[in-house]
Curated annotation (Swiss-Prot):
Lineage summary: Bacteria, Bacillati, Actinomycetota, Actinomycetes, Kitasatosporales
Activity response to pH changes: Optimum pH is 6.5.
Protein name: Crotonyl-CoA reductase
Keyword Repeat tagged: no
EC number: 1.3.1.86
GO molecular function, one term: crotonyl-CoA reductase activity
Length: 447
């Protein structure tokens, strides 16, 4: 049995769940990996100069053992997130430390501690096998997966699974990720594939869509409501493009910050009206690497009020971090909220605390999403309320180049990777719904 036999079954219109269950699994499959013996290959280089094309490998690897509550999924398509870039350049730490720690948890998790790491935190594909105790999913189900992996043996995670002490990001802090022909997931990561999308379109939203949903919409994040003024940094990017869509769909007013006229046009195409091109308007929030410029915060706040009819910001959707955080705290209205999920420009934030405490503002840390939040975010995709931001698709062999392009910010929105799917455009099950939303689905294509 080969992966081609699996692909033939997936592409057959007549294959049943029993047919998929009867398929023999191959002994091995192709997967994107990094190697433990190469973690020092970029020592001494600046982050920008570390090249994922040198560290990312396409290897033939054995199919992992299937455990209770797990599934093996034939991966038709995946995508590249920043965590795969971090893994490939071994920053801020090597992910093999995560695998070693996870491997010590139980005899079953020891499978993850290997000299290679199969990466990737998104997938769209078809269930091949389920382990003991699985009732909700069966072979042949077309699925996407979110990337929250939890053990839930502690009481801490039963109010919000993101608080589970053994919470991990699949394909980053665990092995057997989605940039492969077969992936191993927990079945509480699975969600129905949106029927109107292709495999590569369905795979793309996962991590970033769920992250944006929790950070902006969920009660665990900013709990956005109708009429809120929402400042969105990087509003046309992988995270920001979903935040912009959520704000528009939820009746809020997104104030989109971008860095070029092209990116401003993408925001307009999504329906945004209030847009700030920070490069064109010359905002420099730091005089030098040690000193911020409050005058620039004030100029930025004045521009925001011009766009909102004199109102300040209710919610800031933060992820750049050090470069923008002082400005974010300043421009937020009294009693407003700054939510942060990343620090792409630097982890050590500085802000004037007087503008926080004396104005009763809140800073909320937000990290990925729990199963309910991820499911709700995917449900909005499936209903055509939120749309993929896929701009380009690579082959599995080209994953190194895809990661390089993301690392160097040469992309827009999300970039996809075909795994088992032989070409783009496959997997659509609801052509009528697709036709209704085709312009929005293709909004980021070839940008």
């Amino acid at each position: 049995m080969t992966v081609k036999d699996i692909l033939d079954a997936i592409q057959s219109k007549d294959a049943t769940s029993a047919d998929f269950a009867a398929l023999q699994l191959p002994e091995s499959y192709r997967a994107i990996t990094v190697h433990k013996d190469e973690t020092e290959m970029f020592a001494g280089l600046e982050t920008r100069d570390k090249d994922p094309r040198k560290s990312i490998h396409l290897d033939e690897v054995p199919v992992p053992e299937l455990g209770p509550g797990e599934a093996l999924v034939a991966v038709m398509a995946s995508s590249v997130n920043y965590n795969s870039v971090w893994t490939s350049i071994f920053e801020p730490v090597s992910t093999f430390a995560f695998l070693e720690r996870y491997g010590k948890l139980s005899p079953l998790t020891k499978r993850h501690d290997l000299p290679y790491h199969i990466i990737g935190s998104d997938l769209a594909g078809v269930v091949l096998r389920t382990g003991p105790g699985v009732n909700a999913w069966q072979p042949g189900d077309e699925v996407v997966a979110h990337c929250l992996s939890v053990e839930l043996e502690s009481p801490d995670g039963h109010d919000d699974t993101m608080l589970d002490p053994e919470q991990r990001i699949w394909g980053f802090e665990t092995n057997f990720g989605g940039l492969a022909e077969i992936a191993l997931v927990k079945t509480n990561q699975l969600m129905p594939k949106p029927k109107h999308l292709t495999w590569e379109e369905a795979a793309a939203p996962g991590l970033v869509n769920s992250t944006a949903y929790r950070q902006l919409v969920s009660r665990n994040g900013a709990a956005m409501k109708q009429g809120d003024n929402v400042l969105i940094w990087g509003a046309s990017g992988g995270l920001g493009s979903y935040a912009t869509q959520f704000a528009l769909a939820g009746g809020a007013n997104p104030i989109c910050v971008v860095s070029s006229p092209q990116k401003a046009e993408i925001c307009r195409s999504m329906g945004a009206e209030a847009i700030i091109d920070r490069n064109a308007e010359g905002y420099k929030f730091w005089k030098d690497e040690h000193t911020q410029d409050p005058k620039e915060w004030k100029r930025f706040g004045k521009r925001i009020r011009e766009l909102t009819g004199g109102e300040d910001i209710d919610i800031v959707f933060e992820h750049p971090g050090r470069e923008t955080f002082g400005a974010s705290v300043y421009v937020t209205r009294k009693g407003g909220t700054i939510t942060t999920c990343a620090s792409t420009s630097g982890y050590m934030h500085e802000y004037d605390n007087r503008y926080l405490w004396m104005s009763l503002k809140r800073i909320i840390g937000s990290h990925f999403a729990n199963y309910r939040e991820a499911y709700e975010a995917n449900r909005l995709i499936a209903k055509g309320k939120i749309h993929p931001t896929l701009s380009k698709t690579y082959s599995l062999e080209e994953t190194g180049q895809a990661a390089y392009d993301v690392h160097r910010n040469l992309h827009q929105g999300k970039v996809g990777v075909l795994c088992l799917a032989p070409e783009e455009g496959l997997g659509v099950r609801d052509a009528e719904m697709r036709a209704q939303h085709i312009d929005a689905i293709n909004r980021f294509r070839n940008v």
